[in-house]
Every structure is written in structure tokens, then in C-alpha cells.
Amino acid sequence: MKVVIVTSVRSLLDASIQFQKTACRHHCNYLSMQVVKEIEEFGTINEKNLEFDTWKDVIQNDEIDALVFYRVKQISISTGVLYESMMRNRTKPISMYFVRDCLAFDGNPPSFRMTSCNINAYNRSKIKDLIILMNMKTCNKKIIGEFIIDNFGSVDALLSIVNSNVTWVTSVINNSNGRGINIRVSNNKMLTITSFRRFVNKLKMYKTTKCASQLDNLCTEMNKMDIIDKK
């Protein structure tokens, strides 16, 4: 199957393009897809994008079997409407895959289906280690923050992995007592959802802490520049 990867950001401050590409490439490799092209967009995607030559070359090429997006929210219109617009210039059906959402869209009748999501062994191991660290009273925020950056690159990247593998992450959270030892947990669904949300909220706190630290560093550097200019 020949596919085209489509990544996009909404802000110049968003540095997630490379992570999106990596996630999509891993997904394609997992499903034995051949990536023949990668498209980068700024802003959300709609029918107007299809008017550009880059998109025309892809849409009118019946050798392309599918488009691989990072997530559904990249598209600002109905997925069905976008599909119909593409099919006006094609003789062969085209599929759309959404990596983060674990969804695929196959066209007419418009319908989504679940796809298998793969979390690699490295990420499994590091997420387990992270959960253990977060449950240890002797580990401070600095240590955990550095662990996240060293192993996942950013809090956003980690959150993307976690949100794409809710079931597996939740099972690890609920079966660990913080020392790497499995314990019996309740089958209460509400408790399971709460524990996952609590974990995600904790991760977001590290994102806020990191941003605040970066802002402090930036202000310090600007103050130094101001002092030099005055001299």
C-alpha cells in the first residue's frame, strides 16, 4: 500500500511537526505501508488545500492508496466532505488513517473504523519507569521532569503517546504500587477513568513547570542584553 503522510501545525510556536512525522512513520511501518510523500501544512486542512499543486499531484495519482494524518483535528471540515472532494478527481477509492486517534476512514458510506495502535517496547518500558518514579516519595519534580525530557523529548510528545494508548497505560497505573510490584485493583470503571485522568493532569503540571522555567530563563537573558546595551 502506497501512502502519503500529512502533518500540520496551527502556530509557529508549535514544534510538533517532527514528532507527528515520526509517529506517522512508525504507524506506516507497523502496517507495512510504503510512504511515497510527506506533506506539511500550516493551519487546519479543508477543501481549499486541495486546490494546490502538491495536493493535486497526490489526489490525481491513483497509485496512492491512502493518506496518513496524525489526528482527526487536523481537518477543519467533515471528513466525509473532504473525502468526496478528493474523489471528484479520482477513479480509485482512497483511505484516510489517523494515527493518534487509532481511526481509519474508508469512504462511502462515510464511516470510521478502529485500527490497531502500536506502542513500542522502548516506550512501554519508559512509561512503566515513569509511573514508578511518580509514585516514589523520594523523587522530586526536577528528577521526573528531566526523565520525561531525556526519554520522550517533551511533555507533549509523552502526552500524545499516553492518550493514544489509554487502555494499556491505565492498566499499568492500576496495577503498580510505585515499586514495580503488581497489586490487585478494583474493577470499578469510574476508578479506572479517574486514575488515568489524574495521571494525565500530573503530566500537564510538568509541562507548565517547564514553560515557566523557560520563560524565566528568557527574561534573564533579555535583562542581560539590556544591561549590555546601556553600557
From Swiss-Prot:
Keywords: Early protein, Host nucleus
Top-level taxon in the UniProt lineage: Viruses
One GO CC term, this protein: host cell nucleolus
Encoding gene (name): OPG061
This protein's name: Protein OPG061
Subcellular location: Host nucleus, Host nucleolus
TM ranges: none
Pfam families recorded: Pox_F16 (PF04708)
Family recorded in the similarity comment: Belongs to the orthopoxvirus OPG058 family.
Coiled coil: none
InterPro entries: Poxvirus_F16
Source organism of the structure: Vaccinia virus (strain Copenhagen)
Entry's induction text: Expressed in the early phase of the viral replicative cycle.
